[in-house]
Amino acid sequence: MSFFKKLAASAGIGAAKVDTILEKDAYFPGEEVQGTVHVKGGKIAQDIRYIDLQLSTRYVIVKDDEEHRKYATIHSFRVTGSFTIQPGEEHQFPFTFTLPLDTPITVGKVEVAVVTDLDIQGGIDKSDHDRIFVEAHPWIENVLEAIENLGFRLNEADCEQAPYFQRRLPFVQEFEFVPTSGYYRQMLDELELIFLLDEDGLEIIFEVDRRARGLRGWLEEMYNDGEQLVRVRFSQSELEDTEELEEVLEEILDQYAE
């Protein structure tokens, strides 16, 4: 084996390559993700220590009044352990995993990616980065449609650091809506929602920002920011009955719009 080929491969030139192909591009939390990791040998035989997959995103942290973005691993697992790949040889490793229920929806500034790490012994590791589209879980989709029917439009969505929630991940995804028509346009400035999904149902955290109305409203907003925070849990049956769901959401908003 050429000394220079060895040297080049250790520097990543002519080394094995990795490419991960997913069965499809879009998934929703709780759905099974299937795909295959393709590895092709380079110009020399190489020992592969392992192949790992990570599901990752970025979230906002505020430090010294400045916003920064930090990576977070949503899920990770080992696809395979050690093996040797010969020059030009091809290997395929199928995999399956369930998209975690707390995976953020890819809307607004939120991105989610499957990152493949090919660990090469004595060489530079290779990686593959595949963005995926994460759709809303059907229960959350029903809530979003109901909120839209009540006259709200999604203005912004992002993942923000939230250690006080004591969740598995260091962040929560926040959805910011603005009223565009109807009663709430006169009563509210904005509505922020956080969805905490599990197998049995959905907890929604509402942050309602009331519009200041006259001197009393202005003074109230000055002292407590005009915001009201409420947590409500919905069962599976409540989330699947779209008419009842919209009525319940309207009742909640009416309490805090007055």
Swiss-Prot record:
Keyword terms of this UniProt record: Sporulation
Induction: Expression controlled by a sigma-H-regulated promoter which needs the sigma-H factor for the binding of the RNA polymerase and subsequent transcription.
Pfam family, one: Spo0M
Any one of the GO BP annotations: sporulation resulting in formation of a cellular spore
InterPro entries per the UniProt record, alphabetical: Arrestin-like_C (IPR014752), Ig_E-set (IPR014756), Spore_0_M (IPR009776)
Chain segments annotated as transmembrane: none
Top-level taxon in the UniProt lineage: Bacteria
Record flagged with keyword Ribonucleoprotein: no
Similarity comment: Belongs to the spo0M family.
Function: Controls the expression of spo0A and is required to pass the morphological stage 0 of sporulation.
Protein known as: Sporulation-control protein spo0M
Taxonomic placement: Bacteria, Bacillati, Bacillota, Bacilli, Bacillales
